[in-house]
UniProtKB/Swiss-Prot annotation:
Lineage: Eukaryota, Metazoa, Chordata, Craniata, Vertebrata
Listed transmembrane segments: 23-43, 131-151, 276-296, 324-344
LRR repeats (start-end): 569-589, 593-614, 616-637, 641-662, 664-685, 687-708, 710-731, 733-754, 756-777
Keyword Phosphoprotein: no
Listed name of the protein: Volume-regulated anion channel subunit LRRC8E
Membrane-topology annotation of the record: Multi-pass membrane protein
Organism per entry: Xenopus laevis
Length: 806
């Protein structure tokens, strides 16, 4: 007997696969079980019972067609009927006596009967009648294999198992329930929220007002920090949901590339249809070959004395009924196959739209999917559309951003953020956030913050809670794409004073920054397109009505004409061009109110003529250019308010005599050039307070230096000075004197007359000793005296002790 458990391995599969089995596949599966039971039952009967029973035919026949078994049965029936008629006479007064029946003797023993039965079973019985139950089992197993092949094939089973694993986790995830419940709650409150005032909006956790940057976001950004603890996810659940988002992204990217699942399902369905047609045809034709009486001709006269037999196929009647039942089940199975083909071709299964889910849930950014991803979702819908609805939550970027926000709030509580507060060089209390996946809502609980720096923060969204930062004046966006909501923009527009934006792509510049009407300083750092028409951000400067400082560190070939839009109030304009040659500077002429102008690393060879028309200019900085001559300096006399001139880090070989025309100069920086001689006319600029000639090739300092009675800073380090004029020490207000890395052999004792001296640099010279009079520099401390230790030790003990005490 064949146990049914032996066939378990053919039908066994993971219970989770049921989500990918539509109703027709389930029906087909149960039909195959029924057909399998028919085959197993037939095989059991075939094995356990006699297959055929034969009796010899006393009429000899050479071929099977001559054997008259059927006529024999008819004759037997007729004779029986005639005998019955003769034995049952009509009722008369008298009746004949009963006739005695006598049987035929065949003179065969049991072994001969067994031999004949086996011979006739093999030679006379039709093959369909012999192997019918086995064929049913084989065909049914093939149907089962075809129906489940894509669950076992390596190329498809891995994707299916991965999908089912993710689908189950998404269905059971607490984040799915939370997201759907929040959306359903928000949709009922959306209309009242739009009518609330800004103050009301800021106090409610479920508020969001769309802005150009966020108007298309389907899920309002709730303030996660203020949600009730009953609905809040713990940290572990948040991390699990975050991992699910990553898995869904990777799975979608992997599966949407091809259509292997769809093709495999299509092929196995077509194969089942073809096999169904073949099996139905040959079974319908051959089912009539199952006979109860089977004539048999076997040449066994020498062994048995007979060569023709009439055999009884004992299971013919039952097999014929099983065959008809099998054909009925097979017909229903075929209908499911044809319906599957109809379903496959009726609609585009390689495209799946979440339109109904978007309308029902309110999550408007759920993307439509294609190829194998779409196909498996169509199959899941046939099982239960709720799976797709809950799975769609993990396809939404807005849902992911909200989860990220929740995890951020767990990771960065307000107390932890306060520990990161630092003071900037300007004295502001700054919070620096680096490489975070978003902006925690808890940031807006740090009310004492004055400056917020966001560096490489992905998708930072500034909510209306920013109004809590009443002391916020400065915002830095370093390689950070930031979006603001309408209520946030209303607050920043009136309160933000300083903004720094560093970018790698012009698209990273948020356009909302050009609507900050209270902004006073704007600093842009990044590469702009050489074609200014492709720089739309620079076309919006006209909205910055309060802008006073504009800094651009980029690679411009010409000054944007739109800079003139802020000419009426711009006071400081800086360009750091990173070595790119600045060719066109005509736009400078319109900056009539500019007081400070910096053109750094612009590859300028001469002082631009456009500068000379800036009558309000006070500070001119041309650092790190390629200036060889400054003969045009005479034209700077038109800039009557010019007080600071920085021409440092260039290749200037000499100072022209007409520098004396710049009577108002208070600071002149010519360090890091190639100047050989200092003209005496320079010292006619008697208002100089800061003179830096360090790291040139100067060999002599003119005695006219003593004319500069207001001089407080003198830098002569890195030159070839061998001696200092006595007149230098007439500059009684000198506070900083840098003479390091020269060739000085001694220092005049008159250095003691510099009572205001705070810093004296002498390191790197050829001195053997220091004058004791250096101790008369009452303001000079040991920290301000930069000399070698051995040289310091040449001072008298009392002088050294004085410095040490200080």
């Amino acid at each position: 007997m064949i146990p049914v458990a032996e066939f378990k391995q053919f039908t066994e599969q993971q219970p989770a696969f049921k989500v990918l089995k539509p109703w027709w596949d389930v029906l087909a599966e149960y039909i195959t079980y029924a057909m399998l039971m028919i085959g197993v039952f037939g095989c059991t009967l075939q094995v356990t019972q006699d297959k055929i029973i034969c009796l010899p035919n006393h009429t000899s026949a050479d071929v099977v067609s001559q054997i008259t078994c059927q006529e024999f049965t008819q004759q037997s029936s007729a004779s029986n009927d005639s005998d019955l008629e003769t034995t049952v006479p009509p009722p008369t007064a008298t009746s004949s006596p009963p006739r005695e029946m006598s049987g035929l003797r065949n003179n065969l023993d049991l072994q001969q009967y067994s031999f004949i039965n086996q011979m006739c079973y093999e030679t006379a019985l039709h093959w369909y009648a012999k192997y019918f139950p086995y064929l049913v089992v084989i065909h049914t197993l093939i149907f089962i294999i075809c129906g489940n092949f894509w669950f076992k094939f390596p190329g498809t089973s891995s994707k299916i198992e991965h999908f089912i694993s993710i689908l189950g986790k998404c269905f059971d995830s607490p984040w799915t329930t939370r997201a759907l419940s929040e959306v359903s709650g928000e949709s009922s409150q959306e209309k009242p929220n739009q009518e609330r005032s800004i103050d009301r909006e800021l106090s409610k956790p479920n508020f969001e007002e769309g802005s150009p940057a966020t108007a298309d976001l389907p899920i309002p950004d709730k303030l996660v920090a203020e949600t009730s603890s009953a609905s809040a996810l713990d940290k572990k659940e948040g991390e699990q949901a975050k991992a699910l988002f990553e898995k869904v992204k990777k799975f979608r990217h992997h599966v949407e590339e091809g259509d292997l699942l769809y093709s495999m399902y299509m092929r196995q369905t077509v194969l089942k249809v073809c096999k169904f047609v073949l099996i139905t045809i040959y079974n319908a034709v051959l089912v009539g070959k199952i006979h109860f009486i089977v004539p048999c001709s076997v040449h066994t006269e020498d062994m048995t004395g007979y060569n023709s037999f009439c055999c009884n196929h004992t299971k013919a009647h039952l097999f014929s009924k099983l065959a008809i039942s099998y054909l009925c089940f097979l017909g229903v199975y075929g209908l499911t196959c044809f319906y599957t083909l109809y379903w496959l071709f009726r609609r585009p299964l390689k495209e799946y739209s979440f339109r109904s889910v978007r309308e029902e849930t309110g999550i408007g950014d759920i993307p439509d999917v294609k190829n194998d991803f779409a196909f498996v979702l169509h199959l899941v819908d046939q099982y239960d559309s709720l799976y797709s609805k809950r799975f769609a939550v993990f396809l939404s970027e807005v849902s992911e951003s909200r989860l990220r926000q929740l995890n951020l709030n767990h990771e960065w509580p307000a107390d932890k953020l306060r520990q990161k507060l630092q003071h900037t060089p300007e004295g502001r209390l700054e919070l620096h956030l680096f490489k975070l996946p978003g902006l925690p809502d808890t940031v807006f609980e740090v009310a004492e913050m004055e400056s917020l720096k966001l560096e490489m923060v992905n998708e930072a969204l500034i909510p209306p809670l920013v109004s809590k930062l009443v002391r916020l004046e400065e915002l830095s966006l370093l390689n950070c794409t930031a979006k603001v909501q309408h209520a946030s923009m209303a607050y920043l527009r009136d309160h933000l004073r300083i903004l720094q934006v560093k970018f790698d792509d012009i698209k990273e510049i948020p356009l909302w920054i050009f609507g900050l009407r209270a902004l006073e300083e704007l600093h842009l750092f990044g590469w702009l397109s050489q074609d200014l028409s492709k720089n739309p951000a620079l076309e919006s400067l006209r909205e910055l009505k309060s802008l006073k400082v504009l800094t651009i560190k980029s690679n411009l070939s010409k000054i944007p004409a739109t800079v003139a839009d802020v000419a009426g109030h711009l006071q400081k304009f800086s360009i750091h061009n990173d070595g790119t040659k600045l060719l066109t500077l005509n736009a400078l002429k319109r900056l009539v109110l500019v007081k400070e102008l910096e053109l750094v690393r612009c590859e300028l060879e001469r002082i631009p003529h456009a500068v000379f028309s800036l009558t309000n200019l006070q500070v001119l900085d041309l650092k790190e250019n390629t200036l060889h001559t400054i003969e045009e300096i005479i034209s700077l006399q038109h800039c009557r308010k010019l007080s600071v001139l920085r021409l440092w880090h260039n290749q200037i070989a000499y100072i022209p005599d007409h520098i004396r025309k710049l009577k108002g100069l208070e600071e002149l920086s010519l360090n890091r050039n190639k100047i050989l001689v200092i003209p005496s006319q320079l010292f006619l600029c008697n208002k100089l307070r800061h003179l830096d000639l360090s790291f040139n090739e100067i060999r002599e300092l003119p005695p006219e230096i003593g004319v500069l009675q207001l001089l407080q800073y003198l830098g002569l380090s890195g030159n070839f000075l061998e001696d200092l004029p006595t007149e230098l020490f007439f500059c009684q207000k000198l506070k900083t004197l840098k003479l390091g890395q020269n060739r000085l052999a001694s220092l005049s004792p008159k250095v003691g007359s510099l009572v205001c001296l705070v810093k004296l640099e002498l390191k790197g010279n050829r001195m053997d000793m220091l004058p004791p009079e250096i101790g008369n520099c009452l303001s000079l401390k040991r920290s301000g005296l930069n000399v070698e230790s051995l040289l310091f030790d040449t001072l008298p003990v009392d002088v050294r002790d004085k410095f040490k005490e200080d």
